[in-house]
């Protein structure tokens, strides 16, 4: 190492000397003058000179032998002062003081140091200090006022660096790593980073990160080397990677893309993914999920049909239904609703081609022959359009039970439990007797039969119920109060007429066949089953009877009932008509006519039964719920086209 002055007795430092003992350099060359850098040598020299001055003062005034000893001591002290231990120096250098790297790229900051001797390993310390000024900002604004001021300061002082030379209190200072021997210790801020000190004193970053830009100082500390320059610095700037193309996928490069376009592309991709999930959900949606959860791609549909689901819930929970109360729930006798309109289970319908109406399936039969199930059209009900065709049971042309199930499903689809009310529309009026197959016995339910119509008298028997003449317009006919009629009570039913038969009518009953004007026994009037038949018999003058007894029966049923609110009440009960002052006298001719007809009916019964067998079809086979259930299960297993909604029914 170079020193200020080397050699003894020289000023230019060119002379050199060696110590006497080879292992201890106690007589190393020392400078003539000290410039304040070695304080220990200066203090030793001052003490030696003080002792020398004291010895000389004593020796001059003492014995000559003592003076010789003092001279030896003086020489020894002088030589010991000149031959003290040498002062070593250290020098630290950085080969490249300026580094610019890309983010996440490795970088190494080289640092080397030199010493006169290395009896012990020195301590290497790397420190981080932020820039006093931002180099990146100044590079993008070279015409700023601060840049102009820095340029003026650099021109006046060539060694001035405005980005490095500032107080540590105004910038960030951190210890990066330290090394002593082979042990490397990272600072608290850099724990977990791949940073190490390699070689002599090189600082190595495996990956740079944001915030690594700054000034890094390399310091070497040794207990033996007290002179020289033990510190140097290097600047590091970390830049982000910028290129003219954007690499979206590995090996795929695209041109520069705007930020707003990138956001739009991301939103569209998210929407497409959501739509794809919705479509897959609709395709794979189970039929047992909640009906109120709808798919986003098909909002008009849900996982299962709502109408069918609600009807099934009503059937299983026992809630009364306005469509078929006896089918969906078992009602108590107190809440028994009026019987719905039924389709008669009789012979073929007249007036239609083939004997069937337009809304009846000819090949379907739920209870055997004579039981026809109507098929609903889409135009029959206003709510039929709401039923989705995707959830209907596809009726099979070969299987009659599928038609029945289709009809029942159509009824359930039109069922709305949230709006109870009186039944309306063809769906309610088309109720057939299929709904009563599973009902309990009618004998176990308290019910009241229809009220019988009062018996008409002979005076107004010639007028039909459609006649405008009322009871008040009929003239009162007074009858004589004698005979057996005056002593007999009024008959309240047809069956009570047997007890009121007079002696004269018993014989007339046997002669009734001859009194009918030659009418054959096959076309005798049938036995009266109700009082409506008596009206038809009395109205024979207005409506002549045909030879077909069934036509007469249907004609009596097609006659509209009398309006109870009109003033034409045909009742003979004085309690029902308060305007009459008293009861009219009873006419016995009606009684005689009824008894005569009853006797002829008893004799004509065998012939009538033979005629009825010729008109009516044979009775259907007895219904068995077990057989029907077993056959229904077999048909369901064979039909693979049934949807899962049919199981709810």
From Swiss-Prot:
Positions of the UniProt region annotated as Disordered: 1-21, 414-649
Tree of life domain: Eukaryota
Function according to Swiss-Prot or TrEMBL: Probable role in the clearance of triglyceride-rich lipoprotein from blood. Binds chylomicrons, LDL and VLDL in presence of free fatty acids and allows their subsequent uptake in the cells. Maintains epithelial barrier function by recruiting MARVELD2/tricellulin to tricellular tight junctions.
Gene transcribed to yield this protein: LSR
Modification Phosphoserine occurs at: 365, 371, 389, 432, 436, 464, 467, 493, 528, 530, 540, 579, 631, 643, 646
Cellular compartment(s): Cell membrane; Cell junction, Tight junction
Gene Ontology biological process terms from the UniProt entry: epithelial structure maintenance; establishment of blood-brain barrier; establishment of skin barrier; liver development; maintenance of blood-brain barrier; protein localization to tricellular tight junction; tricellular tight junction assembly
Disease: Defects in LSR may be the cause of familial intrahepatic cholestasis.
Keywords: Cell junction, Cell membrane, Chylomicron, Disulfide bond, Immunoglobulin domain, Isopeptide bond, LDL, Membrane, Phosphoprotein, Receptor, Tight junction, Transmembrane, Transmembrane helix, Ubl conjugation, VLDL
Protein name: Lipolysis-stimulated lipoprotein receptor
Cytoplasmic face residues: 281-649
Compositional bias of kind Gly residues: 1-16
Post-translational modification: Phosphorylation at Ser-365 by MAPK8/JNK1 and MAPK9/JNK2 may be required for exclusive localization at tricellular tight junstions.
Subunit structure: Homotrimer or homotetramer. Assembles into cell-cell contacts. Interacts (via the cytoplasmic domain) with MARVELD2 (via C-terminal cytoplasmic domain); the interaction is required to recruit MARVELD2 to tricellular contacts. Interacts with OCLN.
Organism: Homo sapiens (Human)
């Amino acid at each position: 190492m170079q020193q200020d002055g080397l050699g003894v007795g020289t000023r230019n430092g060119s002379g050199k000397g060696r110590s006497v003992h080879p292992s201890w350099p106690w007589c190393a060359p020392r400078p003539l003058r000290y410039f304040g850098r070695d304080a220990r040598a200066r203090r030793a020299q001052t003490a030696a000179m003080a002792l020398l001055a004291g010895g000389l003062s004593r020796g001059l005034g003492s014995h000559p032998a003592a003076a010789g000893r003092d001279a030896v001591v003086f020489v020894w002290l002088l030589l010991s002062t000149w031959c003290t231990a040498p002062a070593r120096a250290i020098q630290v250098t950085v080969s490249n003081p300026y580094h610019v790297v890309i983010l996440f790229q490795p970088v190494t900051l080289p640092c080397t140091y030199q010493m006169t001797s290395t009896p012990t390993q020195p301590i290497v310390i790397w420190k981080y200090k932020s820039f006093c000024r931002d180099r990146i900002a100044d590079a993008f604004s070279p015409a700023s006022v601060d840049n102009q001021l820095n340029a003026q300061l650099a021109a006046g002082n060539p060694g001035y660096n405005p980005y490095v030379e500032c107080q540590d209190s105004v910038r960030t200072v951190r210890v990066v790593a330290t090394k002593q021997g082979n042990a490397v210790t990272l600072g608290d801020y850099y724990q977990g980073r791949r940073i190490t000190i390699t070689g002599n004193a090189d600082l190595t970053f495996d990956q740079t990160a944001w915030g690594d830009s700054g000034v890094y100082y390399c310091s070497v500390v040794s207990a033996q080397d007290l002179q020289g320059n033990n510190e140097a610095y290097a600047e590091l700037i970390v830049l982000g990677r910028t290129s003219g193309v954007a690499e979206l996928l590995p090996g795929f490069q695209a041109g520069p893309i705007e930020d707003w376009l990138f956001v739009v592309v991301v939103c569209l991709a998210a929407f497409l993914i959501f739509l794809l999930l919705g479509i897959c959900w609709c395709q794979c949606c189970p039929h047992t999920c909640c009906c109120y959860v709808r798919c986003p791609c098909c909002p008009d549909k849900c996982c299962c049909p709502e109408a069918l689901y609600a009807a099934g819930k009503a059937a299983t929970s026992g809630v009364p239904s306005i469509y078929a109360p006896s089918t969906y729930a078992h009602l108590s006798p107190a809440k028994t609703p009026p019987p719905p309109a039924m389709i008669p289970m009789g012979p073929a319908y007249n007036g239609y081609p083939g004997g069937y109406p337009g809304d009846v399936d000819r090949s379907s039969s739920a209870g055997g022959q004579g039981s026809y199930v109507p098929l609903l059209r889409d135009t029959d009900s206003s709510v039929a359009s709401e039923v989705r065709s995707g959830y209907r049971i596809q009726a099979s042309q070969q299987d009659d039970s599928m038609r029945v199930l289709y009809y029942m499903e159509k009824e359930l689809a039109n069922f709305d439990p949230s709006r109870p009310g009186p039944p309306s529309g063809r769906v309610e009026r088309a109720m057939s007797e299929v709904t009563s197959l599973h009902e309990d016995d009618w004998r176990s339910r308290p019910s009241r039969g229809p009220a019988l119509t009062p018996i008409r008298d002979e005076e107004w028997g010639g007028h039909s119920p459609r006649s405008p003449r009322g009871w008040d317009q009929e003239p009162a006919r007074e009858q004589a109060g004698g005979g057996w009629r005056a002593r007999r009570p009024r008959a309240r039913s047809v069956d009570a007429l047997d007890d009121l038969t007079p002696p004269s009518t018993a014989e007339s009953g046997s002669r009734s066949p001859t009194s009918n004007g030659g009418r054959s026994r096959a076309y005798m009037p049938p036995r009266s089953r109700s009082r409506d038949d008596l009206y038809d018999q009395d109205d024979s003058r207005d409506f002549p009877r045909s030879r077909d007894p069934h036509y007469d029966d249907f004609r009596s049923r097609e006659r509209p009932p009398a309006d109870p609110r009109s003033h034409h009440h045909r009742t003979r009960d004085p309690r029902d008509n308060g305007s009459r002052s008293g009861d009219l006298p009873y006419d016995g001719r009606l009684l005689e006519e009824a008894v005569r007809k009853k006797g002829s009916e008893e004799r004509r019964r065998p012939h009538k039964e033979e005629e009825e067998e010729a008109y009516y079809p044979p009775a259907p086979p007895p219904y068995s719920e077990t057989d029907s259930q077993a056959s229904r299960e077999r048909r369901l297993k064979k039909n693979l086209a049934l949807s899962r909604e049919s199981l709810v029914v």
